[in-house]
C-alpha cells in the first residue's frame, strides 16, 4: 500500500516530511495515519543528523483540508470519538515535543485538523496565494477542534481572537493570519520550501506572546478580565444560537478550562466534549448536509449528459434581481454579461449594484482596485437587443407578468442563436406556460434565484416537460459557476421552495389575525431555529410580492393556499415592507432595536391578545411546511428527500441543526406528525389534512432515510 507520508533528508540536515494521500486531490487526516506519522517521528528523533523538519504538502493547492469527516460515522459511541481525539492529541504532542525546529510550509487550504497539525509545529510559513486559507471550521458541522486546537490556538493568538475564529468557523487569508500572529511569514509559492528550510536552519525561536491590543492585554492578562471575555462570548453565542447548537458553548468551555487549569486539563475536556458532539443529533444533521452538498456537486442534474460551455450571458431586467444575477455572473463565474433594460436608470442601478459589491471586496482587501475594474469591465449594458447574437444563455428577471415573459421569449428567439438557453427567474409562474410562446421550448428553463442574489446560496433549476437534458445540465453547471447550490425541480406553481414557504407564511398570518403580536410570532420562530421570523421575512421579501404569488398558487394547487385577508388590508394601506418603509416594523428610526409599527394592528382591525406558547406557535407554522414538502416529493416536484432538505435549508433557512424538513420528520416520526396534523385539522379545517404519503408512512412506520 502506498504511503501518505515520505521523509526526504537534505544535505544541510533538514528533513522534509511530505504529506500526499494517494488517489486524492486534497489531503485529509485519517485515524489510520496515526501509526505512520508516529513511525516517521520516531525515525526523525533517532537520527542525530537531522537538525530540523519541514512539513509540506505534495498536493498542488492544499496543505491539509481537515480531517476525513466520514470516519466519524464509524464511531458507534461517544467514547469511540473520544479515542479519535486522544489519538490526535498523542500524535501532535509527539510532533510538538521534538527537540529540533519543526516548520509547517503551508500552501492552499489549511483547515480543521490541518491547522491543528500546523499549530503543533514550532513555526508556520504560508504562501500569498488566494487559495491559502487557514481556519478551524468544525463548529459548522456541530463539532469542535478535537486535535488540540482549542488549546494551542488561544496560546498563540490570544483568547478573544481564537474564540472568534472557532465560534464562527471563519477562514483567514494569509495576510490576516500574519497580522494575527497565526503564521510567522508570508511568501510567494516559488520560495515557500526554501523559506521554511531557512527557518528550520535558523533554530528554534523563543515562544512569542500573542499579538494583543492594549484592551486585549488588560482583559486577557487577569482572571477577572478573562472571565469577562468568556461570559460575553457565552452571552453572544446564546443570542445567536437560541440554545439550538451545543458546540459553541463547549468550545468556550474547552478554552476556559485550558486557560484556568492548564493544557493537560484542557485537552481532557476537549476530548470529552468532542465525543459528546460527534454523536449528537445536531452534528449528525449538519454532517448530513455536508455530505449531501458534496454529493450534489458531482451531479449534472441530467444523468450522463455533459453541459455545454457558457461563454456569454445576457440578463433581461436591471432591477434588484437582474443586477444581482449579473453581478454573480461576472464576479463569481467570470463570464461576460450584457444587461438589457428599457430604462437607462435601470441599467445604472444594475452597474451601481455590482460596483457596490466589488467595492466591499476592495475595502476588505479581498481584491485590488485593478481586479475590481477588470470584473466591472465584464459587464456591459444596452436598452436594445444589440451585441447578444452569440449569447449562450439569457436570464430573464422581469416582472411576474406572463404576457411580458412571452414577449421576452419571442424577442430572444428572434435575436439570439438557436442554441441560446432562455432561463426565467420567475418565482411562481409555471415554466410550461412561459415556454408556450417558444419555437424552441427545449431551450426554455426556470432558474429561480433568491434575494439577495449575492448572499442566498440556492437556485432552483426548473425543467418543464419539454426542457432538454442538455439545457438542464448546462444550466446546473452555470449556476455552480456562480457559486450557487442548484437543485433540479419539476415544473409547477411555486416550484418547491416558495410552495412550502407559502403555507408557513399563511399560517403565521392566521396567527397574527388571531391576536398574536408581530414580535412574539417572530421570536417564536427564531427560537425554533429560523434565521428570521415570518413577519420580518414578509417585510424583507415584500408584502406585495407575497400577495401576488398567493392567487397563482391557489389557482393551481387549491384552497389550502388561499391567502389570509391580512394581505389585502396591508396593501390597501400601501404597506409593502422595507422597500417603501411601511410594513410590520418601523424603518428609518435611529433606534438600533427593531421596533414593531404598532399602527399595523389598527390596519388589520385587531388588538394583540395574550401571547401564545412559542413552541405551539412554531409547530403550527412548521407542520404546514412539512406536510407540503411531502406532497412535493409525492408529486415528483423534488427528486428526493435529500434535495428537499437542501432546498429548504439553503433557500429559506430551515434550521440546519434539524437536518432539513425530511430528516426532521424522521426524528419526529410520521405517526406523531400525522396525529399533530389531524389535531389541527379538527381545530382549523382541511388546510391541515395530512397528505396520503404521510398517512401511509405512519401506518407502516417507515422513514424517508432508511
UniProtKB/Swiss-Prot annotation:
Pathway: Lipid metabolism; fatty acid beta-oxidation. Residues 308-706 are annotated as: 3-hydroxyacyl-CoA dehydrogenase. Residues 1-188 are annotated as: Enoyl-CoA hydratase. It catalyses: a (3S)-3-hydroxyacyl-CoA = a (2E)-enoyl-CoA + H2O; a 4-saturated-(3S)-3-hydroxyacyl-CoA = a (3E)-enoyl-CoA + H2O; a (3S)-3-hydroxyacyl-CoA + NAD(+) = a 3-oxoacyl-CoA + NADH + H(+); (3S)-3-hydroxybutanoyl-CoA = (3R)-3-hydroxybutanoyl-CoA. One of its GO terms (molecular function) is long-chain-3-hydroxyacyl-CoA dehydrogenase activity. GO terms for biological process: fatty acid beta-oxidation. It is found in: Cytoplasm. Its main location: cytoplasm. Its EC number is 4.2.1.17, 5.1.2.3, 1.1.1.35. It holds the Pfam family 3HCDH. InterPro entries: 3-OHacyl-CoA_DH_NAD-bd, 3HC_DH_C, 6-PGluconate_DH-like_C_sf, ClpP/crotonase-like_dom_sf, Enoyl-CoA_hydra/iso, FA_oxidation_alpha_subunit, FadJ, NAD(P)-bd_dom_sf. The keyword Lyase applies. In the N-terminal section; belongs to the enoyl-CoA hydratase/isomerase family. In the central section; belongs to the 3-hydroxyacyl-CoA dehydrogenase family. Catalyzes the formation of a hydroxyacyl-CoA by addition of water on enoyl-CoA. Also exhibits 3-hydroxyacyl-CoA epimerase and 3-hydroxyacyl-CoA dehydrogenase activities. This is Fatty acid oxidation complex subunit alpha. It comes from Shewanella loihica (strain ATCC BAA-1088 / PV-4).
